[in-house]
């Protein structure tokens, strides 16, 4: 099972159950049936700081992915940590699904390009 730990630091209401379900659907479609994902909702200031720190771009963004590149075998019963997704509700507004899908696909190894776009199209 995919465990999704949600933290909302954005200061606005978020449909957390729908977001968790979407994360699970995308990962399931990618053949991931177990693991843990952090899903964090942040405000524009934190989004901007994270993008500046990690990508060198000084602007708020819709979503960021922080994959954990764990390919080593794990002991039985220990869940794989897939990474964290950070979403800024104030930037994405009602159109939060596409950026969330995009970020989750980064967690499973997709980079920008045709393969990513094809996978994103499956979740529209």
Label every PLM stretch briefly.
Residues 1-99, 104-124:
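An acidic/histidine-cluster motif and surrounding catalytic segment
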């Amino acid at each position: 099972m995919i465990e999704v730990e949600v933290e909302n630091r954005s200061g606005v209401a978020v449909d957390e159950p729908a977001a968790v379900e979407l994360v699970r659907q995308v990962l399931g479609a990618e053949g991931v049936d177990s693991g843990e994902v952090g899903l964090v909702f942040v405000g524009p200031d934190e989004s901007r700081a994270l993008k500046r720190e990690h990508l060198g771009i000084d602007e708020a963004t819709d979503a960021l992915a922080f994959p954990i590149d764990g390919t080593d075998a794990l002991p039985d019963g220990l869940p794989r940590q897939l990474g964290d997704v950070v979403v800024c509700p104030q930037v994405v507004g009602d159109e939060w699904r596409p950026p969330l899908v995009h970020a989750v696909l980064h967690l499973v190894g997709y980079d920008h390009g045709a393969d990513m776009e094809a996978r994103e199209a499956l979740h529209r």
